[in-house]
Amino acid sequence: MKELQDRILKDGQVIGTNILKVNKFINHQVDPVLMEHIGEDFANHFADKGITKVVTIESSGIAPALMAAAKMNVPLVILKKQPSKTLHNDLYQTQVTSFTTEKSYELTLSRDVISEDDNILLIDDFMADGEAATGAIRLLRMAHATVAGIGILIEKSFQPGRRKINEQGYEVYSLARIKYMDEYQIDFIEEN
């Protein structure tokens, strides 16, 4: 998605060679027009998949996932990273380690929001090593739901996430695929 790539080049900041800071438009301050266009792109790409729910992990995936869910006219389910007093014992949980923070957390899904009849579009802001997506897929498998596709805003293609997810048999559709980045440049994989 050229619009997202252009915004990354304009407002993204590379830290080292592995971290891309997108605080100005995705995960601290959110550009609602960009999120609407991202939601439209995901909705169009996955239009023939019979999606019944969009799922994301809190918190940076919420804005684009909500826009996609709205365009598809389906509910959004948010996987929780923190225990909540409103979520009781009837839960699916799995441990996930964040690439960015290098901390582990218990990814949690209430059993009453996803069923075996659901056809899921999983959306997340980044894909690096694929750990978050793999954890979300584990939870959705526990619920016996079908993962119809995975939508990623920014993929670090020089890391193994896509390969890991593809090896599990899932389609990954990324809007901006970075093949190389350092503090001076960001190079994208150009899609046809």
UniProtKB/Swiss-Prot annotation:
5-phospho-alpha-D-ribose 1-diphosphate binds at A128, D129, G130, E131, A132. InterPro entries: PRibTrfase_dom, PRTase-like, Pur/Pyrimidine_PRTase, Xanthine_PRibTrfase. It catalyses: XMP + diphosphate = xanthine + 5-phospho-alpha-D-ribose 1-diphosphate. One of its GO terms (cellular component) is cytoplasm. It comes from the Bacteria. Belongs to the purine/pyrimidine phosphoribosyltransferase family. Xpt subfamily. Converts the preformed base xanthine, a product of nucleic acid breakdown, to xanthosine 5'-monophosphate (XMP), so it can be reused for RNA or DNA synthesis. This is Xanthine phosphoribosyltransferase. It comes from Agathobacter rectalis (strain ATCC 33656 / DSM 3377 / JCM 17463 / KCTC 5835 / VPI 0990) (Eubacterium rectale).
